[in-house]
Amino acid sequence: MTTGKIVQIIGAVVDVEFPQGEVPRVYDALNVVDAQERLVLEVQQQIGGGVVRCIVMGSSDGLRRGLTVENTGAPISVPVGTKTLGRIMNVLGDAIDECGDIDAEEHYAIHREAPSYEEQSNSTELLETGVKVIDLVCPFAKGGKIGLFGGAGVGKTVNMMELINNIALQHSGLSVFAGVGERTREGNDFYFEMQEAGVVNIEKPEESKVAMVYGQMNEPPGNRLRVALTGLTMAERFRDEGRDVLLFVDNIYRYTLAGTEVSALLGRMPSAVGYQPTLAEEMGVLQERITSTKQGSITSVQAVYVPADDLTDPSPATTFAHLDATVVLNRNIAAMGLYPAIDPLDSTSRQLDPLVVGQEHYDIARGVQSTLQRYKELKDIIAILGMDELSEEDKQVVSRARKIEKFLTQPYHVAEVFTGDPGIYVPLKDTLAGFKGLLAGDYDDVPEQAFMYCGKIEDALEKAKKL
C-alpha cells in the first residue's frame, strides 16, 4: 500500500504527492492516516509531478500539510445486500443511525459501468400510483425513470413522500432512498414515518424494506456529489439479484450543484450560468446506470429543483432528456390552493400512448388536456369582457374545465397531519370513470365545489348532496 503526503489544501480539495511511478488512479480512494476520525479522499485529477488532486469525503477542518495518506488502490466501496435494509448510511456506507456497524458480506465500488444494450430491457407495464392526475396524464412505467420538477415550496418532497407511501407500501419489493443535499429534518421525518409504516423495523432489520443513504445540505460538496452513486450502487445490487427495486432520489439538482462546487475548486472554466463544463456527462454517468436489465428492474423517482421556476435552466433541462415521465409542479396551481399542484398540460409521459394505456385511457387524458387548454386560452377574454360575452359552447367548456381542475385535487396520506383530511388512494379505473363522466357532461349540474379534495366521482356526488 503506497503512501503520500498532503501538499496543499483548498477547502474541499486536497493535493497529495506520491512517489513517481506509484501515483493513484483517478477515482481511487485514499485514507488520511493521522486524521482524528475516518477521512477518505477521492482522486479527481493527476496534475503531474506525482501530485494528485482529490475531493474530501468529509470536513477538511484540522487537515494540514505533511499528513500521511494511504492509497487503498480501489474506488470507494460500500456495503450492499440485505444487511443495508432498515439502516441509514453516509456516502462511505458507514452506519449513522447508532444501531451498530453493518456487517455486509459484500462491498461494491460506487463507480461502475452502466449495463450494456444487450443486458437492458424495456417494459411497458404500468405502475399505478393512486394519484389521479399522475395516473391520468403522465402514467409511470415499471422500471422507468420519473422526474418531479418544481420550484421552491410547491410540493416536490410531499409528492415524493406520497409516492413512497403509495408505491413502496403497496409494492412488496425493496426501496432505496438517497437524500442528496436536502434538509436533515426531512431525512429525520422520513425515517420516523417509515418506522410508523412498518417499512423500517429496528428490532428486526431483516424485515425492513428500505435502505437510506444521506448526504445532507450541511455536508461538504464531495459527500453530496457521491451520495447518489452510493444509493444507486445498493439499488443495482438488489436489481442484479432479480428483484424489482424502487430508487428515490431527493434532490438531483443538489447533485448538479455539488458538481459545480467541486468543478470550481478543481479550477475548471465554468460554462452556461456558472455550471460545470462536464454537466451533461456527470448527469449521464448517473442516469445511464439507473436502468432495468433482464434480471430485475429499477424504477426511479427523482425530485428536481427548478431554480427560479425556469425549466430552461441547464440543470433541469439536462435532466429532462433522461426521463420517461416528467411531473411538473406549477406555482400558479399551488397559489389557487389546488393540491397536488401538478400541471396536467406540462406533465408528460412516454407511456401515454394508445398502444400502451389503451385507446379509452388515451382519449380521456387528451380530452381533459384539450378542455383545460381551451379554458386557458379563454381566461384572457373572461378577464377583459367577463363570462357573459362567451358563446354557450365556451361557457360549457369553462364550467367543465373548472370542475376538472377541482377533481384533479385529492387529499394525501402524508399531508393528513396538516390538513386533517384522511388520504385517499384512487384506483386507475375509478379515475378514468370520473373524468369520462365529466367530459361527457354527466355532472354538468353538480356544483364545482363538490369536486374539491375528493377521491372517486361518487365522493363528489355525496359531497354535492350536503352543499
From Swiss-Prot:
Topology in membrane: Peripheral membrane protein
Catalytic activity annotation: ATP + H2O + 4 H(+)(in) = ADP + phosphate + 5 H(+)(out)
SMART domains assigned to the protein according to its UniProt record, in alphabetical order: AAA
EC annotation from Swiss-Prot or TrEMBL: 7.1.2.2
One Pfam family hit: ATP-synt_ab_N
Gene Ontology MF term list: ATP binding; ATP hydrolysis activity; proton-transporting ATP synthase activity, rotational mechanism
Gene Ontology, cellular component aspect: plasma membrane; proton-transporting ATP synthase complex
Entry's localization field: Cell inner membrane
Residues that coordinate or bind ATP: 150-157
CDD domains, alphabetized: ATP-synt_F1_beta_C, ATP-synt_F1_beta_N, F1-ATPase_beta_CD
Protein keywords: ATP synthesis, ATP-binding, Cell inner membrane, Cell membrane, CF(1), Hydrogen ion transport, Ion transport, Membrane, Nucleotide-binding, Translocase, Transport
InterPro entries: AAA+_ATPase, ATP-synt_VA_C, ATP_synth_F1_bsu, ATPase_a/bsu_AS, ATPase_alpha/beta_chains, ATPase_F1/V1/A1_a/bsu_N, ATPase_F1/V1/A1_a/bsu_N_sf, ATPase_F1/V1/A1_a/bsu_nucl-bd
UniProt family annotation: Belongs to the ATPase alpha/beta chains family.
Subunit organization: F-type ATPases have 2 components, CF(1) - the catalytic core - and CF(0) - the membrane proton channel. CF(1) has five subunits: alpha(3), beta(3), gamma(1), delta(1), epsilon(1). CF(0) has three main subunits: a(1), b(2) and c(9-12). The alpha and beta chains form an alternating ring which encloses part of the gamma chain. CF(1) is attached to CF(0) by a central stalk formed by the gamma and epsilon chains, while a peripheral stalk is formed by the delta and b chains.
Function per UniProt: Produces ATP from ADP in the presence of a proton gradient across the membrane. The catalytic sites are hosted primarily by the beta subunits.
Protein's name according to its UniProt entry: ATP synthase subunit beta
Taxonomic source organism: Aliivibrio fischeri (strain ATCC 700601 / ES114) (Vibrio fischeri)
Lineage: Bacteria, Pseudomonadati, Pseudomonadota, Gammaproteobacteria, Vibrionales
